[in-house]
């Protein structure tokens, strides 16, 4: 087995990048397309809206509870094995989704899809780190960030297009050929990594699943206005499981919950920046369709087209940021990017009464460009701050931070709309501005002496490892 010490050589690197991108496109987009199809699926399968929401919730819950355990498993058995297993499960589950003729069967298939998606998401950044030479890591993460952002933003539009020409099973059928192609490429081209010398911690995996599963369920319950006793019980259970998890993990050398990485100042600050920014992003993503429809009367098709400049701007900004981070501090780039993001969101919240096409599109593009400028340097910092052998823990924590921020953002939109009716969408945009500014402030803290020391410590350790010291 040939282990890469500083990335893969071409053409293997190119094929590995394509494999990682296909898996990410499928897993991220499937989280977005189901929302659009929910009314159609519920009507076709004769299900109530309350029950049909589990098509979305089951997928998200499976990812939430398994991201960190699968990232830890990737360190133990090898990242490519976890990634390929995730691809295989995701593809098979997609076939089950196509064949499902009841809501119960479809929900079970979606939960299986979620576990497969977690296998893909949990180790994808670790694979990127082992695919690219260290000097090109920022560019690799830029491409990765572009794929994630564009897939998430374009998912609803693509779903609407598919539903316009075919039934809802087509949404899941498209994953089958893509998954098979990715499996063939992955087996041949993904990098091998050296397994860690410790066993999988089943007890911590269960506690982690309870902590994040119950925690995000509590946030969702609050957002949807469910009984306060239920939300309080879920939150209390999450706190108890979390305390037990930390006690179990705090003395471990390679903990499933990466406490060792969170002790590195620049890593912890990057995680906090990520949570705040993705909260702002999801506040905007969920609120914008309501805002544009209720306030300005745009149709669903028009809204999809008006939002398109956002992912296009991300597609340009994220790879550019990947090159800039090789020359400028991530804290500075992230701070500037999130301030631009905040300006774009604020400008959208203050659109004129009768906006022109240009009025909307330049604001969308500014928000997308700002987010793209932030995301790549932030992700690179999180991955590079971890010792190479802890890439899995960093990758899993990156995905968990993103999911946590998005869940909080979506719950807040529900809360604002329930409390303030149609004005809630505009209030949500102003809240998104606040989270973006908070993220910018935290990002610039990485320029402090403590943050610099954390980054320098990791660079020294990495240089020593590369030189065999």
Positions of predicted regions on the chain:
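Catalytic tyrosine of NAD(P)H-dependent dehydrogenase/reductases that use a Tyr as the general acid/base
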Residues: 59, 106, 197, 310, ...
């Amino acid at each position: 087995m040939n282990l890469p010490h500083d990335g893969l050589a071409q053409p293997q690197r190119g094929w590995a990048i394509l494999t990682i991108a296909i898996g990410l496109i499928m897993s991220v987009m499937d989280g977005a397309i189901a929302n659009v199809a929910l009314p159609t699926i519920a009507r076709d399968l004769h299900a109530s809206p309350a029950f049909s929401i589990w098509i979305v919730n089951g997928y998200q819950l499976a990812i939430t509870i398994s991201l960190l355990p699968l990232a830890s498993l990737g360190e133990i058995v090898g990242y490519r094995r976890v990634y390929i297993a995730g691809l295989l499960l995701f593809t098979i589950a997609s076939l089950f989704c196509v064949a499902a003729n009841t809501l119960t069967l479809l929900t079970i298939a979606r939960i299986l899809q979620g576990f497969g998606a977690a296998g893909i998401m949990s180790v994808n950044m670790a694979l990127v780190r082992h695919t690219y030479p260290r000097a090109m890591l920022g560019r690799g993460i830029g491409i990765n960030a572009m794929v994630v952002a564009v897939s998430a933003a374009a998912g609803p539009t693509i779903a609407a297009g598919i539903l316009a020409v075919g039934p809802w099973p087509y949404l899941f059928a498209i994953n089958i050929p893509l998954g098979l192609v990715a499996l063939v490429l992955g087996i041949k081209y993904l990098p091998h990594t050296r397994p860690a010398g410790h066993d999988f911690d089943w007890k911590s995996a269960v506690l982690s699943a309870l902590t994040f599963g119950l925690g995000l369920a509590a946030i969702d319950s609050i957002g949807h206005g469910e009984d306060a006793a239920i939300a309080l019980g879920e939150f209390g259970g999450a706190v108890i499981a979390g305390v037990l998890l930390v006690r179990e993990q705090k003395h471990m050398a390679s903990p499933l919950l990466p406490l060792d990485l969170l002790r590195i100042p620049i890593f912890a600050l990057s995680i906090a920046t990520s949570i705040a920014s993705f909260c702002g992003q999801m506040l905007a993503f969920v609120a914008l369709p309501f805002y544009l429809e209720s306030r300005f009367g745009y149709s669903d098709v028009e809204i999809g087209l008006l939002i398109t400049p956002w992912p296009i701007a991300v597609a340009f900004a994220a790879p550019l940021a990947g090159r800039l981070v090789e020359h400028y501090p991530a804290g500075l780039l992230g701070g500037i990017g999130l301030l631009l993001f905040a300006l774009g969101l604020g400008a959208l919240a203050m659109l004129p009464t009768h906006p022109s096409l240009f009025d909307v599109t330049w604001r969308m593009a500014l928000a997308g460009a700002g987010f793209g400028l932030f995301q790549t340097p932030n992700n690179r910092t999180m991955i590079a701050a971890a010792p190479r052998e802890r890439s899995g823990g960093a990758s899993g924590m990156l995905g968990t931070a993103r999911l946590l921020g998005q869940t909080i953002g979506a719950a807040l939109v529900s809360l604002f709309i329930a409390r303030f009716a149609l004005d809630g969408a505009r209030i949500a945009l102003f809240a998104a501005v606040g989270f973006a500014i908070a993220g910018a402030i935290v990002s610039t803290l990485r320029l402090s002496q403590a943050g610099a020391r954390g980054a320098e410590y990791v660079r020294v350790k990495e240089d020593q490892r590369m030189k065999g010291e």
